[in-house]
């Protein structure tokens, strides 16, 4: 089965588009996938969104972090007839929320589980887009995809991942991810 790990960055911030209700107006700046078939990354820009959507649709499973609540919603205006929310998807943030009843960040899970950190933030990614620093933007997105992939693989192999609580203590959460 081809597993596709996916993340995207946007051209705008919520404050630029009038809030979360206008998520589709954020617009894709950069997206990155990693596929188990190729064991490699692919970078997509806004003009490449049709190819990105085709790759997501061809996946046996899509893996992401907040992909259902964010990434798929950002993609909706590019493919209004596609039903991305019905793709076979493991949204790691959503899965952890169902167990914990609160949201955890990718950075918290990455630091606690892997000892890795995100290299920047979504705000920084928008700034890089606006400054034309496309290599930095795509490298940042690749790092997020790689971290997400490694968290998924860790959870598959060990049956748990970890996160840092608001008090800074490392906590373990059981996962039952199909691998």
Where are these regions (language model features)?
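Anionic, Ser/Thr-rich low-complexity intrinsically disordered regions
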Residues: 111, 174-179
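Acidic, Mg2+-coordinating catalytic module of metal-dependent nucleases/exonucleases
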Residues: 115-173
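Generic detection of short hydrophobic beta-strand segments and adjacent strand-loop junctions
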Residues: 43-44, 173-175
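Hydrophobic side chains within alpha-helical segments
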Residues: 30, 74, 94, 147-148
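Conserved DEDDh/DEDDy metal-dependent 3′-5′ exonuclease domain
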Residues: 36-108
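A residue-level signal for conserved active-site and pocket-lining positions in enzyme catalytic cores
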Residues: 7, 110, 144, 148
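A polyampholytic, Gly/Pro-enriched intrinsically disordered region
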Residues: 103-119
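Conserved RNase H-like, two-metal-ion catalytic cores of nucleic-acid enzymes
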Residues: 1-57
């Amino acid at each position: 089965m081809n597993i596709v790990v996916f993340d995207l960055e946007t051209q705008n911030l919520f404050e630029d588009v009038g809030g979360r209700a206008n998520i589709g107006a954020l617009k894709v700046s950069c997206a990155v996938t990693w596929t188990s078939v190729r064991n490699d990354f692919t970078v997509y820009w806004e003009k490449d969104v049709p190819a990105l959507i085709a790759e997501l649709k061809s996946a046996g499973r899509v893996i992401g972090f907040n992909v259902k609540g964010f990434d798929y919603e950002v993609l909706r205006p590019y493919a209004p007839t596609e039903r991305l929310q019905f793709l076979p998807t493991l949204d790691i943030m959503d899965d952890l929320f169902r167990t914990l009843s609160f949201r955890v960040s990718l950075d918290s899970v990455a630091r606690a589980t892997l000892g890795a950190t995100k290299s920047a933030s979504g705000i920084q990614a928008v700034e890089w887009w606006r400054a034309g620093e496309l290599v930095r933007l795509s490298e940042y997105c690749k790092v997020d995809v790689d971290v997400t992939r490694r968290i998924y693989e860790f959870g598959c192999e060990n049956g748990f991942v970890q996160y840092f609580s608001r008090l800074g203590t490392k906590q373990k959460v059981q996962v039952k991810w199909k691998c």
